[in-house]
Every structure is written in structure tokens, then in C-alpha cells.
Swiss-Prot record:
Native species: Sodalis glossinidius (strain morsitans)
Encoding gene (name): mnmG
UniProt subcellular location: Cytoplasm
Sequence positions that bind NAD(+): 273-287
Highest taxon above the source species: Bacteria
Entry protein name: tRNA uridine 5-carboxymethylaminomethyl modification enzyme MnmG
Coiled-coil annotated spans: none
Gene3D superfamilies given in the database record: FAD/NAD(P)-binding domain (3.50.50.60), GidA associated domain, C-terminal subdomain (1.10.150.570), tRNA uridine 5-carboxymethylaminomethyl modification enzyme MnmG/GidA (1.10.10.1800)
Residues binding FAD: G13, G14, G15, H16, A17, G18, V125, S180, Q370
GO biological process: tRNA methylation; tRNA wobble uridine modification
Length: 629
């Protein structure tokens, strides 16, 4: 044998799903092969130069909690960090980082190249090696055959990808890369349900041609947030601002006048696009009452002149793209350096997958990322990690693992995909999780790091840091419980000004911190209750666990209760539009199916667990919580 050709796990594709899958498998001790058509594009950001956001940041933290790569890479490549929803409760706060594409890609590649048990090889895959209903390897474009006990497909938008710019279209996996036509054809020969989806990207603009003096400036947060539980702000490169402009009546008129030249509106594109990241032509038509749409001008890196105009994804012809850009303030003389485009690609119905992301039809074959109908780097990376660890477990002869809905956003993601499927690119939101108070960014490690350790994903450094943090949290909570103060105590005159009402009875530190007007920093600034913890992560946990203790306990009770509501009856001939909080889509499905019980309602495609929770609350208020015999 002149070259290694037998592995435990093969990963096909080196994007965000593929890199996490490869790292997970290799960390668990499996000999892993990562096949990519171009080593230089490992971890490439094909669309927006950013990581995180509402729901997405939660996934990144969960990946990190289990030893994954994405959070550590963005800490090294992020050029602007912000906490979204900072003024709201901890459940919906989310970290977002603007990325330097080059630095991020370098961080990913560096981690991969230094990972034991992982071999990277540059070759496109054209076929799978099958033995009956089991996959046993892959064949590359020059006929090399590699065998493995498990294969993970993380091929993104490359399967029979077709790029559209106006009425022109050509084959491509993304701009500048070839599609994967042979592999797409081979997969279509297997017993999968296949369909087409669409996504898009905006034109890129030369920063030298923008009049920034006419734009609003958006800076990052101070102090600087970090993504990884092991990270620090010292790892971040130089931080720079983003800028804001707006579409206007002129922009919208240009779009309306050229809809006949849009491949989407002309019926040339058959794939369904992302509902929550629509093209600018879609936004103008769907929200005709809006006078303007906010556009964020995001730098693509510290050494790049390219600007990503977040909010004007389009497949309109290039001349129309120029008119759209020039219609906006500050961009009147802007130069486009890369045209925007839409891309259509194959995706495979995720209802054909187990919750481990292994195919129900082909043993040993796993799917992760956009091939499953999702959109976004974070959704892809989370699936990649799960598929990679389960491919490794299969190779080791062990049972698969997947998180529950009350355990992780990753659990929500795979349950939604594998149970309900999707007809449009699926994006994660906090609203998709019915137990979001438990599934916060800040406690992702407390939820998942111990599991990651048991699975073999978490190294000694992370584990020791995690155990020390847990110990600090419990020790500090006990310390606050043990410190009592009463109205006549020494130092109460320092405490009372911090309270809405002066102390009238004895209270300990935890009880004081539970008050809405008190926070951990102010409490521990008092000599009696100080000093504060130096570890900011542990200090944050102490405050959240104490302040939200009652709410968290109630949500844990709700989880147990939800399991008991399978046979709870719904009123006959019920009009679900009378239930406040249900989406129009859910109301339509419930009124159409007329379920007799909560159990039946929960199995209707599109009726989310969050909607079931709303129904249970409504039944309780109406005094209708009856169970069938």
C-alpha cells in the first residue's frame, strides 16, 4: 500500500459542517479523513462575514462547550464583537462577531492541521462505495478509493449547484468554485427524497468608493465580549466599526421596474429561498408599506477593501445591482467588485435521518449542514459536530447520541429537522425553543461540557477549567447564603440606599441579590458581602442562577409536565384563532386538522412545541385541562 486508504471516518466537504465533523471524529480518537476540493478554502465564509446572532450565537456556545472549533476561531478572527439584546433577559442575549475572513479561515485551518488522528486530502468526491444498504467509502475524481466505517456528507450548496445573475446562469458550488454534479447524480440514484433550495448573497463593494462621512457608524461593545468559554479579549485582533445606510423610494422603484429580469420572479429559479434572509427584491415586494430597509455595511477584513452590504442579497442583473447600490446614501459613486447572485442546490429531506444525523436508509452515512435544508454557518457547524461524533461512535461500535430539546438548541435543531422536515432554508431562532430560559448562551458549558467529556470530545484543559468554574459558583452561592444582615446590623446604612425599600427583616446575600434592584457587582462592592469573584463567567452564573431560580424551577416542572400531556383533550370544534400567541401558520394547520388532543396536535407538521406550550396555558386558563380515559 503506497498511501493510506482505510480510515474509521471519512468527511466529504471542508466547510463549517465538515471542519467541525472532522475535529469531533478525530478528537474522539478515530482515524479521520477530510476530503475537500480545495484545502485553501477550509472554513471559508461563503456569504456574510460574521458568526453568531440571535439563536445562532447559542449554537456556537454549545459547539464550544463540547470542545468544538467555531468559537475559538472567531475569537482569533473577530474584528467587531457585540452582545445583541443586551438590555433583555439572559435567555435571549446573543453574541455576534464580525469576522476577518482571512483570519477566521487561518484559525480553522491551523486547528485542523494540528489535530491528531486527522488527515486532510484535496480531491473532489464523485461516488460512494456501497455494500448493499451500507456505505463503506468514497471515490475521488481521479479514481482514488478510500474506505471507512462511516461517511459524513457536508457538501453545502455544491450538489448540482446553479448560480443565477439575472437571466444568466451557470453551474457552480459558489462563486469561483465548481459544483459537485457526479456526486449529486449518484445520491439521486439512492432511495432519498431530494428537492431544491435557493440562497443568495449581495454584491461586494470597494470601500475606497464609499463616502463614509454620510453614513451612521456602529462600534462594537466595550468591554469586548468573547465567544469561547476558554477565550479572552486579548486574542481578538484590532477592532473596527461597521456602517449603516438605508434603501429608499428610488431603490424600491428600480427593483419594481426590473422584476421581469429577476430569475426568481420570472420562474427560472425553482428552489425556495430563506424566509428570514430574503433577497432585497423579495423584501421590497413583501413589505410594500416600508419606505426604507436598513443596510449594514460590514468590512470583510483588516486587510481587505471589500465591504459586505448586509441586506441587499440579490439575483438581479448586474446593471440593476449597480443602480440599487448607487441609489443609497453614501454609495452614490460606489464600485461593485463582485456581483451578487442566487444559487440553487440539492437538499435531502432530513426526515430520512435519525436524530444522530445518520441516514435511516443507508447505514453508516451521515448528513450535516445545508444538505439537510438549513441555512447559516452556525447551524451547519452544530450539525457537523453532531454527525462527526456519531460517525465516530458508530465506527467504535457504540450507540449514537443526540441532545434533547430541553438540553440544547442543537437538540431543537435536529428534532425540528428530523421530525418536521423543512420546505425552506431552516434558520435557528430563540423562539423555536420552548425551554429557552434553560438554554442560555451563558450556561452552555453547564449543560453540555460534562456530556462532551463523557463522549471523549472535551480535553483536559477545558475540563479542568470547567470543574474549577463549577466549584467557584457553588462556593460563592454558599458564601452568600451564609452572610446575614438585619435592620440593626453594622453596615446596613450602606445597604439601604441600594434598595428600593429599606431592610425590615433579616436577609442573607442570596435573598438580597434576588431583589430586582440589586445586582452581584453592587452587592459585593459592599464590605460585608465582598470580595466579588474574579472570574466574570462564574460571577455571571451566580447572579443568573439566584435571580431566576424560581423561573428556572417552573420551567423544569413544565418539562416534566409536558411529557404527561399526551392525552390532554382539546375542545370539539375549537377555533384556534381565539388562542393568543399562535402564529397564523400554526392556526391554519390546527383548524385544518382539528386535533382531539394535545398529543395529536403535537404530531401535526409545523405545529411547534412552543405552540403546544401556548395551548396548554390556554387550556389551564379556560379550566379545560381534562385527560382522555
Amino acid at each position: 500500500m503506497f498511501y493510506p486508504d482505510h480510515f474509521d471516518v471519512i468527511i466529504i466537504g471542508g466547510g463549517h459542517a465538515g471542519t467541525e465533523a472532522a475535529m469531533a471524529s478525530a478528537r474522539m480518537g478515530c482515524q479521520t479523513l477530510l476530503l475537500t476540493h480545495n484545502i485553501d478554502t477550509l472554513g471559508q465564509m461563503s456569504c456574510n462575514p460574521a458568526i453568531g446572532g440571535i439563536g445562532k450565537g447559542h449554537l456556537v456556545k454549545e459547539i464550544d462547550a463540547m470542545g468544538g472549533l467555531m468559537a475559538q476561531a472567531i475569537d482569533k478572527g473577530g474584528i467587531q464583537f457585540r452582545i445583541l439584546n443586551a438590555s433583555k433577559g439572559p435567555a435571549v442575549r446573543a453574541t455576534r462577531a464580525q469576522a476577518d475572513r482571512v483570519l477566521y479561515r487561518q484559525a480553522v485551518r491551523g486547528a485542523l492541521e494540528n489535530q491528531p488522528n486527522l488527515m486532510i486530502f484535496q480531491q473532489a468526491v464523485e461516488d460512494l462505495i456501497m455494500e448493499g444498504d451500507r456505505v463503506v467509502g468514497a471515490v475521488t475524481q481521479i479514481g482514488l478509493k478510500f474506505r471507512a466505517r462511516a461517511v459524513v456528507l457536508t457538501v453545502g450548496t455544491f450538489l448540482d449547484g446553479k448560480i443565477h445573475i439575472g437571466m444568466d446562469h451557470y453551474s457552480g458550488g459558489r462563486a469561483g468554485d465548481p459544483p459537485s454534479v457526479s456526486l449529486s447524480r449518484r445520491l439521486r440514484e439512492l432511495p432519498f427524497r431530494v428537492n431544491r433550495l435557493k440562497t443568495g448573497t449581495p454584491p461586494r463593494i470597494d470601500a475606497h468608493s464609499i463616502d463614509f462621512s454620510r453614513l451612521a457608524t456602529q462600534h462594537g461593545d466595550d468591554p469586548l465580549p468573547v465567544f469561547s468559554f476558554l477565550g479572552s479579549a486579548d486574542q481578538h485582533p484590532r477592532q473596527i466599526p461597521c456602517y449603516i445606510t438605508y434603501t429608499n423610494d428610488k431603490t424600491h422603484e428600480v427593483i419594481r421596474q426590473n422584476l421581469d429580469r429577476s430569475p426568481m420572479y420570472a420562474g427560472i429559479i425553482e428552489g425556495v429561498g430563506p424566509r428570514y434572509c430574503p433577497s432585497i427584491e423579495d423584501k421590497v415586494m413583501r413589505f410594500a408599506d416600508r419606505d426604507a430597509h436598513q443596510i449594514f455595511l460590514e468590512p470583510e477584513g483588516l486587510t481587505s477593501n471589500e465591504i459586505y452590504p448586509n441586506g441587499i442579497s440579490t439575483s438581479l442583473p448586474f446593471d440593476v445591482q449597480m443602480k440599487i447600490v448607487h441609489s443609497m446614501q453614501g454609495l452614490e459613486n460606489a464600485r461593485i467588485v463582485r456581483p451578487g447572485y442566487a444559487i440553487e442546490y440539492d437538499f435531502f429531506d432530513p426526515r430520512d435521518l435519525k436524530l444522530t444525523l445518520e441516514s435511516k436508509l443507508i447505514e453508516g452515512l451521515f448528513f450535516a449542514g445545508q444538505i439537510n435544508g438549513t441555512t447559516g454557518y452556525e447551524e451547519a457547524a452544530a450539525q457537523g459536530m453532531l454527525a462527526g461524533l456519531n460517525a465516530a461512535r458508530l465506527a467504535m461500535g457504540k450507540d449514537g447520541w443526540s441532545p434533547r430539546r430541553d438540553q440544547a438548541y442543537l437538540g431543537v435543531l435536529v428534532d425540528d429537522l428530523c421530525t418536521l422536515g423543512t420546505k425552506e432554508p431552516y434558520r435557528m431562532f430563540t423562539s423555536r425553543a420552548e425551554y429557552r430560559l434553560l438554554l442560555r448562551e451563558d450556561n452552555a458549558d453547564l449543560r453540555l461540557t460534562e456530556t462532551g467529556r463523557q463522549l471523549g470530545m472535551v480535553d483536559d484543559v477545558r475540563w479542568e477549567r470547567f470543574c474549577a468554574k463549577q466549584e467557584q459558583i457553588e462556593r460563592e452561592r454558599q458564601r452568600l447564603r451564609d452572610i446575614w444582615v438585619h435592620p440593626g446590623s453594622d453596615g446596613v446604612e450602606q445597604l439601604n440606599p441600594l434598595l428600593k425599600a429599606s431592610l425590615t427583616r433579616e436577609a442573607n446575600g442570596e435573598e438580597l441579590l434576588r431583589r430586582p434592584e440589586m445586582d452581584y457587582a453592587r452587592l459585593t462592592h459592599l464590605e460585608r458581602f465582598g470580595p466579588a469573584l474574579v472570574d466574570s463567567q462564574a460571577a455571571e452564573q451566580v447572579e443568573i442562577q439566584i435571580k431566576y431560580q424560581g423561573y428556572i424551577a417552573r420551567q423544569q416542572e413544565e418539562i416534566a409536565r409536558q411529557m404527561r400531556n399526551e392525552h390532554t383533550l382539546l375542545p370539539a370544534a375549537m377555533d384556534f384563532s381565539t388562542v393568543s400567541g399562535l402564529s397564523n401558520e400554526v392556526i391554519a394547520k390546527l383548524n385544518d386538522h382539528k386535533p382531539n388532543s394535545i398529543g395529536q396536535a403535537s404530531r401535526i407538521s409545523g405545529v411547534t412545541p412552543a405552540a403546544i406550550s401556548i395551548l396548554l396555558v390556554w387550556l389551564k386558563k379556560q379550566g379545560l385541562r381534562h385527560r382522555s380515559p
